[in-house]
C-alpha cells in the first residue's frame, strides 16, 4: 500500500507555515471514532512517557490488523523530560487536530526542543526510503560572500554528516545518530545546524539520508536565513540563531575561525590556497569517476546481465536478480578450493569467494544429491530476495545451470555464532554485552520475518550455526532453505516431512508436523539458553547434569532458585545478573509446551527493552523430563529483580508491541 505522509516542521514564524501549504493527504482513510481512530489516540497518548523512559526514542504498535497502528516518537538527546513530553504532546495534538481521517502522518516540531512523531497503518521500522522529503525555508533572505560561505558550509556539513552517522551503538536511542554544531561566518554571523536520524537506520543509511538532505538544502535554502529538510527517517536544520534546545546539549567546541585562505589579499585576487581548495577536489572526483567507470565496464563484460528466473511460489512469479555464470563462480572460489570452504549445511557447502570487482562473497553450492535441492533453491531465492533487513544476510545473486544450483550471499567475516560460542578458546571473545546485543539483533531479525516484512516468514531452522556475525558482531540470520511463507490468516501449517535440527524443534512439530511462528519462538528460546551457557543443547545428553536435555536442566535450575549456575564461566564474573536472569526467564517462556503460552516476537522485544514489565510465570517447558516425583512448582517473585508493577505496562504486554 503506498504511503503518503503529512509533514510539519513548526519552528519560528520565519518559516513558511506547513499547516497552510501541506494539508494531510493520503490514499487511505479511517472513519472517525472507529477502532483505528481509538488505537491511534491511545498510542499517541502513550508515546511521551515511553519516549522519555527509553532514552529519547520509542517505537510500538497497538491493536490487531486491520486496525493496528504503528507509531514512533523521538526527542533530541539530553532533552529534559518535561520539555520532551511537552513537545510530543504538542505534536500529538497537532496531528489529531489536523489529520482527522488520514491513516499515515509524520511531524517534526520545534518548541522548547525538537521532537518527531510518525504513525501508520503499516509497519515501517527498519525500512529506509529517501523519498518523499519536504523543504521549509525562511522567508527572509541572507546576503554574504558566496565563496567564503560555501567553504564554511562544506566543512561544517561534511563534519556533521560523518559525526552523526558514525555511531556503532547497538542500542536504539535518540542520541544514536545525532549531532549539533556551529560555525563562524565571515560577516560575524554564526551558523547553527543540527542533524538527526532515527536509530533503526544503519550508519550507511543515515549517512545517505543526511547527505541528500544537505544537497536539498543547498538547492532550496542557501541565500535564506535558515531552513529545514525533513524525511521519513532523518532531519537537517540550519539557522543563524540557536533553536529548539539543540545547542544546550551539543558537544562544546570553539567556533571555527575563517581559514587563512579566506582572508582577502590587497590585490583583490584569490590566494593560491583558495584556488587549490577548489581545483584539487574537482580533479580527485574526476579521477575516481573514471576509475569506477572503467571497473564497471570490465565487470560488466565478465558477468551475465540481470535475467529473469521464474519461481512460482506463493504468488511471487518473477524476480529480476543478478545471475552469474558457473565459470565466474569457479574463478571467485578458486575452483571451490578447500582452503576457501567456510562450512557445510544440510543442503550443501559454503565457500568464500572474491568477485572480479573485489567484492567478497559467500557461495552456497547446493548438493547435487539432495532430493530437495531444486525446491530449497527456489525457496531460498524467492524468500531472501524479498527480505531486506540489517539482521538478515543479504542475497547478492545466483547461478542456475543444469548441474549447478548456487546462491551468492554477502560475506560475513566473523563466520557463525557457533564458531565462537561453543569453542572454549574463542567463547571468551563474546562477553555478556556482545551476547546480549546478539540476542537483541536476532529478536529484531525474527520480528521482521514474522511481522514487519511484506511476507510473513517462518524460518523453521533457527540455530547457532545459522546466525552469522559481521565485523562488528552484529548478528545476521541465514539459511532460508526450510523457511515457509505463512498466509495472512494462517496461524498453523502442517508438513509430512519433518526437517530441522533436533533440540531446537518444538513438540508440536516433532510429534504432529505442525509449524507456526511459535515454532520459531521455541527455537529462539533454546538459542537464548545456548548463548547464555555457551554449550550446545545436545551436549546435555552426555553431560553429568541429571537432565535429559537443555530445557530440562534450565528448568531445574530455575525451580531450585539457582538460574545463574547456567551462565558460561567465561562471562560469569562480568555480566549483568538482572539481564541474565531476565533473559533466562524470557527463554523459558519461549519454550513452553503449548504454543499459545509462548510470547510472540513483538512481546519478546518489549520484554527485552523494557525491564519494568512484569513477566508471566513459566510452566514446565516442552520436552521437559520429570525426575522421580518432581513437580512444577515455582515462586515467580524470586526472579523479577528490579521489576515494578505499573498498570500501563501491564497492558502493554498484550497491546503495545515495540519492535
From Swiss-Prot:
Topology Cytoplasmic: residue spans: 296-659
Gene Ontology molecular function: ATP binding; protein serine kinase activity; protein serine/threonine kinase activity
UniProt-annotated catalytic positions: 461 (proton acceptor)
Stretches assigned to the Extracellular side: 19-274
Gene Ontology terms: cellular component: membrane
Listed InterPro entries: GNK2, GNK2_sf, Kinase-like_dom_sf, Prot_kinase_dom, Protein_kinase_ATP_BS, Ser-Thr/Tyr_kinase_cat_dom, Ser/Thr_kinase_AS
Domain Gnk2-homologous: 19-124, 131-243
Pfam families: PK_Tyr_Ser-Thr, Stress-antifung
N-terminal signal peptide: 1-18
Mode of membrane association: Single-pass membrane protein
Annotated glycosylation sites: 26, 33, 50, 59, 111, 145
Family to which this protein belongs: Belongs to the protein kinase superfamily. Ser/Thr protein kinase family. CRK subfamily.
Reactions accelerated catalytically: L-seryl-[protein] + ATP = O-phospho-L-seryl-[protein] + ADP + H(+); L-threonyl-[protein] + ATP = O-phospho-L-threonyl-[protein] + ADP + H(+)
Keyword terms, alphabetized: ATP-binding, Glycoprotein, Kinase, Membrane, Nucleotide-binding, Receptor, Repeat, Serine/threonine-protein kinase, Signal, Transferase, Transmembrane, Transmembrane helix
Transmembrane residue ranges: 275-295
Name this protein carries in UniProt: Putative cysteine-rich receptor-like protein kinase 12
Gene3D superfamilies in the record: Gnk2 domain, C-X8-C-X2-C motif, Phosphorylase Kinase, domain 1, Transferase(Phosphotransferase) domain 1
Domain Protein kinase: from-to ranges: 336-613
Residues that hold ATP according to the record: 342-350, 364
Subcellular location: Membrane
EC number: 2.7.11.-
Amino acid at each position: 500500500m503506498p504511503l503518503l505522509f503529512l509533514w510539519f516542521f513548526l519552528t519560528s514564524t520565519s518559516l513558511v507555515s506547513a499547516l497552510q501549504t501541506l494539508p494531510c493527504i493520503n490514499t487511505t482513510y479511517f472513519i472517525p471514532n472507529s477502532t483505528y481512530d481509538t488505537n491511534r489516540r491511545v498510542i499517541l497518548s502513550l508515546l511521551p512517557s515511553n519516549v522519555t523512559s527509553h532514552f529519547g526514542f520509542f517505537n510500538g504498535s497497538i491493536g490487531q490488523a486491520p486496525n493496528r497502528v504503528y507509531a514512533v516518537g523521538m526527542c533530541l538527546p539530553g532533552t529534559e523530560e518535561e520539555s520532551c513530553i511537552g513537545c510530543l504532546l504538542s505534536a500529538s495534538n497537532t496531528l489529531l487536530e489536523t489529520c482527522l481521517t488520514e491513516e499515515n502522518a509524520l511531524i517534526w516540531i520545534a518548541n522548547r526542543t525538537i521532537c518527531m512523531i510518525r504513525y501508520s497503518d503499516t509497519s515501517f521500522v527498519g525500512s529506509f526510503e529517501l523519498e518523499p522529503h519536504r523543504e521549509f525555508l525562511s522567508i527572509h533572505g541572507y546576503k554574504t560572500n558566496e565563496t567564503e560561505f560555501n567553504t564554511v558550509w562544506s566543512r561544517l556539513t561534511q563534519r556533521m554528516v560523518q559525526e552523526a552517522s558514525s555511531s556503532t551503538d547497538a542500542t536504539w536511542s535518540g542520541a544514536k545518530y545525532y549531532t549539533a554544531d556551529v560555525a563562524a561566518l565571515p560577516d560575524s554571523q554564526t551558523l547553527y545546524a543540527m542533524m538527526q536520524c532515527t536509530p533503526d537506520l544503519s550508519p550507511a543509511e543515515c549517512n545517505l539520508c543526511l547527505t541528500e538532505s544537505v544537497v536539498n538544502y543547498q538547492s532550496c535554502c542557501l541565500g535564506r536565513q535558515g531552513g529545514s529538510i525533513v524525511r521519513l527517517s532523518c532531519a537537517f536544520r540550519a539557522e543563524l540563531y540557536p533553536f529548539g534546545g539543540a545547542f544546550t546539549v551539543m558537544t562544546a567546541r570553539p567556533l571555527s575561525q575563517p581559514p587563512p585562505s579566506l582572508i582577502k589579499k590587497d590585490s583583490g585576487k584569490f590566494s593560491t590556497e583558495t584556488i587549490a581548495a577548489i581545483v584539487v577536489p574537482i580533479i580527485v572526483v574526476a579521477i575516481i569517476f573514471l576509475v569506477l567507470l572503467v571497473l564497471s565496464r570490465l565487470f560488466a563484460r565478465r558477468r551475465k546481465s540481470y535475467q529473469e528466473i521464474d519461481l512460482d511460489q506463493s504468488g511471487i512469479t518473477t524476480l529480476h536478480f543478478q545471475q552469474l555464470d558457473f565459470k565466474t563462480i569457479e574463478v571467485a572460489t578458486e575452483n571451490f578450493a578447500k582452503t576457501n570452504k567456510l562450512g557445510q549445511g544440510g543442503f550443501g557447502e559454503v565457500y568464500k569467494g572474491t568477485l572480479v570487482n573485489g567484492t567478497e562473497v559467500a557461495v552456497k553450492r547446493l548438493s547435487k544429491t539432495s532430493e530437495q535441492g531444486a525446491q530449497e533453491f527456489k525457496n531460498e531465492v524467492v524468500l531472501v530476495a524479498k527480505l531486506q533487513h540489517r539482521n538478515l544476510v543479504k542475497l547478492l545473486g545466483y547461478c542456475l545451470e543444469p548441474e549447478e544450483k548456487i546462491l551468492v550471499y554477502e560475506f560475513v567475516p566473523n563466520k557463525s555464532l557457533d564458531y565462537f560460542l561453543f569453542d572454549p578458546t574463542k567463547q571468551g571473545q563474546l562477553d555478556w554485552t556482545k551476547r546480549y546485543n546478539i540476542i537483541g539483533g536476532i529478536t529484531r531479525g525474527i520480528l521482521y520475518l514474522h511481522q514487519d516484512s511484506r511476507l510473513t516468514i517462518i524460518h523453521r531452522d533457527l540455530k547457532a550455526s545459522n546466525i552469522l556475525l559481521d565485523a562488528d558482531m552484529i548478528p545476521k540470520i541465514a539459511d532460508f532453505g526450510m523457511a515457509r511463507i505463512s498466509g495472512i490468516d494462517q496461524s498453523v501449517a502442517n508438513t509430512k516431512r519433518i526437517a530441522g535440527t533436533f533440540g531446537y524443534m518444538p513438540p508440536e512439530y516433532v510429534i504432529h508436523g505442525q509449524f507456526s511462528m511459535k515454532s520459531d519462538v521455541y527455537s529462539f528460546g533454546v538459542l537464548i539458553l545456548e548463548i547464555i551457557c555457551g554449550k550446545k543443547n545436545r551436549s546435555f545428553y552426555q553431560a553429568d547434569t541429571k537432565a535429559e536435555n537443555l530445557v530440562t536442566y534450565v528448568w531445574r535450575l530455575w525451580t531450585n532458585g539457582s538460574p545463574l549456575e547456567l551462565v558460561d564461566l567465561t562471562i560469569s564474573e562480568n555480566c549483568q545478573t538482572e539481564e541474565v536472569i531476565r533473559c533466562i526467564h524470557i527463554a523459558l517462556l519461549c519454550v513452553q509446551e503449548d504454543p499459545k503460552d509462548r510470547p510472540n516476537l513483538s512481546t519478546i522485544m518489549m520484554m527485552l527493552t523494557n525491564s519494568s514489565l512484569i513477566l508471566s510465570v513459566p510452566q514446565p517447558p516442552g520436552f521437559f523430563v520429570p525426575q522421580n516425583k518432581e513437580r512444577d512448582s515455582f515462586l515467580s517473585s524470586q526472579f523479577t529483580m528490579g521489576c515494578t508493577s505499573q498498570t500501563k505496562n501491564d497492558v502493554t504486554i498484550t497491546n503495545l508491541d515495540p519492535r
